[in-house]
Regions:
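Conserved beta-loop-alpha segment that forms the PLP phosphate-binding cup at the N-terminus of a helix
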Residues: 61-90, 94, 98-102
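Active-site phosphate-binding strand-loop segment of PLP-dependent enzymes
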Residues: 123-180, 193
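Conserved active-site segment immediately N-terminal to the catalytic lysine
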Residues: 187-199
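Active-site-proximal loop->helix
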Residues: 100-113, 118
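Conserved PLP-binding catalytic core of the aspartate aminotransferase-like
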Residues: 294-313
C-alpha cells in the first residue's frame, strides 16, 4: 500500500473544484492560532468580529450565525427554522442541489411546488411569477442561486422581492457555492435568509457555514422555535445577544481561518472581488471555447463562479 502524501502548508497545486477551493496561506496560518476558551473575552472578540464582517459581505443589517457545519447544515437550518407541516413552498429545481433542498422541504412536511427546468437552464422569472399568482397562500420561496451540478446561476434575484412582498412570503437563498464571488444585496433585494459555505467562494477551509437572517425572519424563528437542539437558531440569537457566545462548542481553529478569509475579502473590496470573478469567468469561458469545449449551461443561465462542461465526443 502506497503511503498517503501529506499536504504541505504552502499551496502546491490548483484545486479546480466548486469547493473546497485553494486556501490562502494567511488563512491556513490563522488556523494554527493557539486554542482558547470559547466562553472567554478572546472568543467574544473573535466571534463578534467574524459575525460583523460576514454581515458586511452579505450586505445585510440582519444577524449572522456562524454554524460549525457544512453548507448543507446551514441550508437545513433554514428549513427547520422556517417551515412547518403543511406550509406551501415554491422552489425552482434544475439539478442535484436544488433537488436536495426540495427534498429537505418535503421532509419538513411542506407542500412543495417545484418549478422544474431542463438541467443547464433555469426556471424563468415569468414561471416564478405564475407560481406566485396561482398560490396566494405560499409561505416561502426558496432557490439555489448557483446550481453547482449544472453550472447555472439565477439572474433575477433582485426581482423576486416584488412577489414575496405581495404574498407576505419568506425569501430564502441558498448561496452555498457563490456568495463572495458574485454580487449579493441581501437587504436591497428583500432576502430574508441566505447562507453559504466557507470552503467555496470565501476560500476558507470547510466547516464553517454562515447563515444570515433579517429581523422579520428572526422574529418568526424566535416565536416558532423548531424541535431540534443544534440547528435551533433562536438559541444562537439568544446566546449572541446575551454574551456574544454560541450555544455549543464551535470549531475554533476554523473560526480563526474564516475570520482571516473575511479580512482578505474586505481588504480587496467586495466590488473588486466580484469584478475579478466576472473577468476571470469570461476569460475562462472564452479559452474553453477556443479549445472546442462547450459549457453545459445555456449562455443566459451560466454561472460566473462554477463552470460545467459537456463531455467531449
Amino acid at each position: 500500500m502506497k503511503p498517503i502524501k501529506k499536504a504541505k502548508l504552502l499551496m502546491e497545486y490548483l484545486v479546480m473544484l466548486p469547493g473546497p477551493t485553494n486556501v490562502p496561506e494567511r488563512v491556513m496560518r490563522a488556523m494554527i492560532t493557539p486554542m482558547i476558551n470559547h466562553r472567554s473575552d478572546d472568543f467574544v472578540e473573535l466571534y463578534q468580529d467574524a459575525v460583523e464582517k460576514t454581515e458586511q459581505v452579505f450586505k445585510s443589517n440582519g444577524e449572522a450565525v456562524l454554524l460549525s457545519a457544512s453548507g448543507t447544515g446551514a441550508v437545513e437550518a433554514s428549513v427547520v427554522n422556517l417551515i412547518k407541516k403543511g406550509d406551501k413552498v415554491i422552489i425552482p429545481t434544475n439539478g442535484e442541489f436544488s433537488g436536495r433542498l426540495a427534498q429537505m422541504l418535503e421532509w419538513a412536511g411542506a407542500n412543495v411546488i417545484k418549478l422544474e427546468s431542463t438541467p443547464g437552464t433555469n426556471a424563468t422569472f415569468d414561471q416564478v411569477k405564475e407560481a406566485f399568482d396561482n398560490n396566494k397562500d405560499v409561505k416561502a420561496f426558496y432557490c439555489v442561486w448557483n446550481e453547482t451540478s449544472t453550472g447555472t446561476m439565477i439572474n433575477y434575484l433582485d426581482k423576486v422581492k416584488n412577489l414575496t412582498a405581495r404574498n407576505d412570503a419568506f425569501y430564502v437563498v441558498d448561496g452555498v457555492s457563490i456568495v463572495g464571488g458574485e454580487d449579493l444585496e441581501m437587504d436591497k433585494w428583500g432576502i430574508d435568509v441566505a447562507m453559504t459555505g466557507a470552503q467555496k467562494a470565501f476560500a476558507a477551509p470547510p466547516g464553517i457555514s454562515p447563515i444570515v437572517v433579517n429581523n422579520r425572519a428572526k422574529k418568526y424563528m424566535n416565536e416558532n422555535p423548531p424541535k431540534t437542539m443544534y440547528f435551533n437558531l433562536s438559541r444562537y440569537f439568544k446566546y449572541y445577544e446575551e454574551a456574544k457566545h454560541t450555544p455549543f462548542t464551535p470549531a475554533l481553529p476554523l473560526l480563526y481561518a474564516y475570520r482571516e478569509a473575511m479580512n482578505i475579502i474586505l481588504e480587496e473590496g467586495i466590488d473588486n472581488r466580484i469584478r475579478r470573478h466576472r473577468i476571470c469567468s469570461q476569460a475562462f469561458y472564452s479559452g474553453l471555447s477556443e479549445l472546442g469545449l462547450t459549457p453545459f449551461a445555456k449562455e443566459e443561465d451560466r454561472s460566473t463562479v462554477v463552470v460545467a462542461l459537456n463531455y467531449c465526443k
